[in-house]
Regions:
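Residues that flank catalytic or metal-binding motifs in active/ligand-binding sites
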Residues: 11, 34, 130-132, 232
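Short, solvent-exposed loop/beta-turn-alpha elements that line the ligand-binding surface or hinge
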Residues: 24-25, 35, 122-126, 203-212
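Surface-exposed intrinsically disordered loops and tails
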Residues: 65-80, 178-189
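Pocket-lining segment of extracytoplasmic ligand-binding domains
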Residues: 76-175
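Secondary-structure end/capping motifs
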Residues: 141-225
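Conserved C-terminal helix/tail region of periplasmic/extracytoplasmic solute-binding proteins
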Residues: 215-241
């Protein structure tokens, strides 16, 4: 049995498009996505789920499609699963969805011909959606209350350390690498891990008590989207004694 200690990531997904495309905002997204084509990494995983939840929030009709060369002559948004190498300034998609740090790397490598044209977290609202949570075994929590309190404090402070001017990118990369299995490497490097990228990853710790309602809301939205029930009992959310 596990309990959730808190949320540690609040969304790192962004909208990319050619420089000439208009940026997506809460006020214009329904109109701009009419008849559009959207390329999305990991369409049948979290990235695609988050995109579709945002579209549902704005009552935007959409359809998952396979033929990437087709025109869209409807009022719906057509969504396609794409690979990372398909996200280019000359792609046939109006907008493309990807995650940091790949987003900033794409922008830099195309010399700004590809630009960030929307923030999926901002479009979702509510200070982003809960993308990753921290859990611990219930019996471990019960037997190690002080350790859990100290650990949660350290996790919260770590967000500040990541963004501190005195923290070098190489330090962050090494800190992550030190905790990976042998042979595994981080998905980012000291070259592409800027302070802006770290900030865009929305890494911060919100305790379970303070983010419970946000998590429940997002689970309900996932349930509606996928036709399955995702829920968490009150006992799942850790509250310090």
């Amino acid at each position: 049995v596990y309990k959730m200690l808190g949320t540690v990531t609040h969304g790192n997904l962004y909208v990319l498009a050619a420089a000439a495309q208009e940026s997506l905002t809460a006020s214009n997204i329904p109109e701009l996505l009419k008849g559009s084509k959207i390329g999305c990494l990991q369409l049948n995983n979290f990235v695609g789920y988050a995109l579709r939840i945002v579209l549902d929030r704005y009552d935007i009709e959409y359809e998952v499609r396979q033929n990437k060369e087709e025109a869209n002559d409807t009022d719906k948004a057509y969504i396609y699963e794409v690979a990372a190498n398909e996200i280019t300034p000359t792609a046939s998609y109006d907008y493309m969805i990807a995650a940091e740090p790949a987003v900033s790397t794409k922008v830099a490598n195309t010399q700004n011909k590809l630009q960030v044209k929307g923030d999926l977290q901002e479009l979702y609202g509510e200070n982003g959606y809960p993308q990753a949570v921290l859990v611990a075994k219930a019996d471990f929590i019960e037997e190690n209350g002080q350790f859990i309190a100290d650990f949660m404090q350290a996790v919260a402070e770590n967000a500040g350390w990541l963004l501190a001017d005195t923290t070098e990118a190489a330090e962050v990369v090494q800190a992550v690498a030190d905790h990976l299995p042998d042979g595994a490497t981080p998905s980012f490097t000291a070259e592409n891990l800027t302070k802006e990228v770290i900030e865009n990853c929305a890494v911060r710790f919100d305790g379970a008590a303070s983010c419970k309602e946000r998590v429940n809301t997002f689970l309900a939205e996932l349930s509606d989207l996928l036709g399955k029930t995702f829920s968490a009992a009150d006992a799942f959310y850790y509250t310090a004694e």
